[in-house]
């Protein structure tokens, strides 16, 4: 890691053996000598001060949308050559997407590395609200009436607790990265339900409707 000429990845501290550890080491000036290329894995939609130049070092900061590029260029404090508007490869297939099934895709976002896991996860508002949705009788009836199905795909970092969710209907399935390709789900769905995930940009790009289910907006 420390000997590489280039470190290229979709997360900060790309290729680090331990992302959190090496992030803190970099903050103390202990950085790999290779050029840092941040590809990103979505469009930035929030204030992310920890990505500003005063807190993070990058040699190339890839931007996926022009307004995002202008925002990063004007507010993040990097030299002008660092942020570059070149687009994200994840959008390339979306241009050719023509499929649309009678499927509702539910994709809530990550809740942070300190969010409860294991049995404690069952006591969180996240679990309670989405489990309630998955077992909602009115929703089951609506899916049956309209001949739709619902697919629940939690953020990849939350999927370690996916097995704790239960479906109340054969029209509602709980899936993961092991069984489904997330981009195919985005291309196939007729509608997206999310809380705060920037994946809504992908669905908006496809000109499909988005419903926001933000039960903890004041806390998140």
Name every feature range the model reports, one short phrase each:
Residues 179-220:
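A donor-sugar binding/catalytic signature common to diverse glycosyltransferases
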Residues 89-165:
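Conserved catalytic-core segment of nucleotide-activated headgroup transferases in glycan assembly
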Residues 6, 35, 60, 103, ...:
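Structural motif
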Residues 19-42, 123-132, 207-219:
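A short, gly/pro- and small-residue-rich
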Residues 160-177:
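Nucleotide-activated donor-binding/catalytic signature segment of Leloir-type glycosyltransferases, i.e.
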Residues 29, 54, 142, 184-185:
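Structural alpha-helical scaffold elements that stabilize or flank donor/cofactor-binding regions
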Residues 1-94:
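Active-site and donor-binding regions of nucleotide-sugar-utilizing enzymes
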């Amino acid at each position: 890691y420390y000997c590489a000429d280039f470190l290229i990845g979709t997360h900060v501290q790309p290729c680090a053996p331990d992302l959190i550890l090496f992030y803190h080491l970099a903050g103390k000036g202990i950085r790999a000598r290779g050029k840092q290329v941040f590809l990103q894995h979505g469009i930035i939609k929030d204030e992310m001060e920890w990505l500003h130049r005063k807190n993070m070092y990058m040699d190339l900061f890839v931007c996926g949308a022009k307004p995002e590029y202008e925002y990063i260029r004007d507010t993040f404090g990097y030299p002008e050559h660092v942020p570059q508007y070149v687009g994200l490869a994840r959008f390339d297939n979306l241009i050719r997407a023509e499929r649309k099934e009678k499927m509702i895709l539910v994709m809530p976002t990550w809740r942070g590395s300190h969010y409860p896991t294991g049995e404690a996860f069952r006591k969180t508002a996240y679990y309670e609200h989405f489990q309630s949705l998955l077992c909602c009788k009115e929703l089951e009836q609506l899916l049956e009436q309209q001949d739709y199905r619902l697919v629940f795909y939690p953020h990849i970092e939350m999927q370690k607790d996916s097995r704790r969710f239960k479906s109340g209907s054969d029209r509602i399935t709980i899936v993961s990265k092991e069984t489904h390709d997330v981009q195919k789900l985005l291309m196939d769905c007729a509608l997206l339900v999310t809380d705060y995930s920037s994946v809504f940009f992908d669905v908006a790009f496809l000109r499909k409707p988005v419903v926001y289910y933000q039960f903890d907006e004041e806390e998140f």
